[in-house]
Amino acid sequence: LRLGAYQILYLDRVPDSAAVNTSVELAKISGRGQASGLVNAVLRKIAQNKTALPPIPERDEAKYLSIRYSHPKWLVKRLLSILGREEAEAFLAANNDTPPLTVQVNPLKTNAESLIKELEGWGVKATPHPWVPGCLELTGAGDLTTLAPFREGKLLVQDPAARLVSLIAGVQPGQKVLDLCAAPGGKSFSAAFAMEDKGEIVSCDLHKNKLKRIQEGAARLDLTSITPSAGDGRVFRPEWAERFDTVLVDAPCSGLGIIRKKPDVRYKKADDLFTLPVIQTALLDNAAQYVAPGGVLVYSTCTILPEENEQVTDAFLTEHSDFCRD
């Protein structure tokens, strides 16, 4: 009943009749054939009156939002405590949308205006991103990897928020940059664009098998400033001590800020998140040792939980008086 009602009320591409028929068949398949008549009658009634249904009582706010937007109740309660009702509901609704495909222009090969025209020639509509410079939103791209602009390295598929990391870092040509949790390489590539591929970027990741993707991406984009390196970002490497002008720590996290990109993230258990701040703190503490005097340390995640963001950086600043928040 709940699956069918959801399809009828919230999914535009599923005809009401299909939602009813499928739900009836599911009732029969699940061994509840005696309930199929009830399922049929209730769902048909909902379909006939879906514009005049009374509002659902919200005696349990978190439970209501959990059902309405298909998120676990523990997460909804946490979001309500962080964001408040209005912003939390907007966040939950956005998580059920399909994110636009966003690419960053490779300024070493082309510019936004030229790339927009070239993509249009391939039947792809491209528009400048509304708030991230150097990025485009694409419509009708299909398999982007088959298009010449992709194969020729004129663009990088990247979420706009990831692009912000290199902008915030303010990297400059000729600098030395360490990307401590680099795979699959997007932030390293973005930094190389900003540095005009001049300088040194060490792209480190714990998983050696992921370095191949960084190498392949750098080759496609014709970037020569990037050197992949395998290693645990929590383990000190003396040869890197105070060596880098900028160190990027895009720490492993719960991923609760990218649910619409990775819908399965919403089904993580609350207990799974407890160890993450320990890992994040260890990465940040170790990364601090690699920053040259006067350098920049950037900490980023793709989550909205304070335990993984503000609380980690606040604790770090308490222990490292030689750093300050910019």
Which stretches of residues belong to each language-model region?
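S-adenosylmethionine
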Residues: L1-D326
